[in-house]
Design a protein with these regions (language model features):
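Bacterial N-terminal signal peptides that target proteins for export
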Residues: 1-10
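C-terminal motif of bacterial Sec signal peptides marking the signal peptidase cleavage site
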Residues: 17-20
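A sequence-level/structural motif corresponding to short, flexible coil/turn segments enriched
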Residues: 22-422
């Protein structure tokens, strides 16, 4: 009888192992079957029934799909869609109150998202309102793989925080960066912040960074191989030559920290006027690509700007647009950056004023020499913008944008930025 029991349990164990292997194979096959070669520009689903949306960023997911975040009807919003741009599910965070105050209605919107180890997503948010009458601030939120809310945490202060980026760390917890509202233009409150949260949304630590002015902010963060972090953004000039209260001139700001958020190195790159960074990627060789903008002369327009930096924030190579000779190009910029699967090509998403309104634009660069390879425009009559580029499952790119109708669209291109419309 004992022998029969042993044989039974042994057979059961083998069966469970086989089933587990089949499940793993199914997951791997599902992932390996991704990559439908397609391009399109299409409306986000359910605009007519649920109202228009605004998108901030898109993230590629392992199950042949994507998630995007932004806001809809004044509150944060997340959506999941397949390779063809067809909606899988859609979630609006109605449990978060729409900000109301002395100057009308504001909104709270999702600005960043990252995958979590349990198959869900962590989301960071900002608010449009700083006035105390709104009592509004950004959030960090966790949802499961179906978009169901697991927890929501408001940033810890009675003043507005604006979360700009979030990542899951190699340790499994979360890092958020952004800026917070200071009480005056000239201040010692340090307006940029980095915060670390555990998997349950409990604050582990928060650090503030900056100088004497109120426009210091972080826009993006990545984790270094040693467990520390690099945050990038802008640092406002501070000296007797500059007036925090009026000019707001800034440098591109690169800050390297340890795992506890303590500054190890920082650099400020720029000339006399406006420079800033909006995104950073790891190039895989100990250097980093940054997307931003520069305006080195007050009478000249701002130029889109790609920079390659070493781990200390020193410029190794760079590209920027030439100055325009007319009034066009006043606010050209690169906002988001990805590295293509070849490991050699960086593609930046931004906008370019072509004289007829801002247009959605992609620029491709040799990631290391910073030489421009190609560029592509997706403009139509009227004003447009684009945000949130991601690698696509077929090797192309995917991002959010708005066109002449103001309706939010998903743009899907091939690896050369081309869209074939049939």
């Amino acid at each position: 009888m004992k022998i029969l029991n042993v044989k039974f349990y042994l057979a059961l164990a083998i069966a469970l192992i086989v089933l587990q292997c089949e499940d793993n194979d199914s997951e791997q096959n599902a992932s390996s079957n991704c990559g439908i070669e397609t391009t399109y520009i299409k409306d986000v689903d359910n605009i007519d029934s649920l109202g228009n949306a605004s998108g901030s960023t898109i993230l590629m997911v392992d199950d042949c799909s994507y998630v995007g975040v932004g806001h809809r009807a004044g509150v944060p919003w997340i959506t999941k869609f397949n390779e063809l741009g067809e909606q899988v599910w859609d979630k609006k965070f109605d449990e978060i109150p729409i900000p109301q105050g002395n100057y009308g209605t504001g909104l709270i919107y999702a600005t960043g998202v990252d995958k979590t180890n349990d198959g869900g997503f962590v989301i960071v948010c900002a608010t449009t309102m700083n006035h105390p009458s709104y009592n509004a601030s950004g959030r960090i939120m966790k949802v499961d793989s179906s978009g169901t809310t697991e927890w929501i945490r408001e940033f810890p202060t009675n003043r507005p925080y604006h979360g700009r980026d979030v990542i899951q760390t190699s340790e499994g917890d979360y890092i958020v960066v952004g800026s917070w509202y200071t009480t005056s233009a000239v201040t010692n409150e340090k307006s940029a912040f980095m915060a670390r949260y555990d998997v349950d949304g409990n604050l582990i630590w928060i650090e503030r960074y900056g100088g004497e002015c109120d426009e210091d902010e972080f826009q993006a963060v990545i984790q270094k191989p040693d467990g520390g972090f690099i945050a990038v953004g802008k640092f406002e000039h501070e000296s007797s030559d500059y007036n925090c209260d009026f000019y707001g001139y800034t440098d591109l700001w690169f800050v390297s920290t340890d795992s506890e958020g303590q500054v190890l190195e920082e650099t400020k790159t720029g000339e006399s006027y406006w420079e800033s960074a909006y995104d950073i990627i790891d190039l895989g060789d100990g250097t980093y690509g940054l997307a931003g903008r520069r305006r080195h002369q007050r009478q000249k327009p701002s130029n889109a700007w790609y920079i390659r930096m070493d781990q200390s924030g020193n410029v190794l190579s760079e590209w920027h647009e030439p100055d325009y000779v007319n009034s066009s190009g006043k606010n050209d910029a690169l906002y988001d950056l990805i590295l293509l699967p070849d490991g050699e090509t960086a593609v930046a998403l931004g906008y370019k004023d072509d004289g007829n309104g801002d247009s959605q634009y992609l620029w491709a660069f040799n990631a290391r020499t910073s030489e421009e390879i190609w560029n592509a425009s997706y403009n139509e009559p009227g004003r447009g913008f684009a945000l949130g580029i991601s690698n696509a499952h077929d090797g192309g790119m995917i991002f959010f944008g708005k066109k002449e109708t103001g309706r939010l669209k998903i743009f899907k291109t091939d690896e050369n930025g081309m869209v074939m419309l049939y």
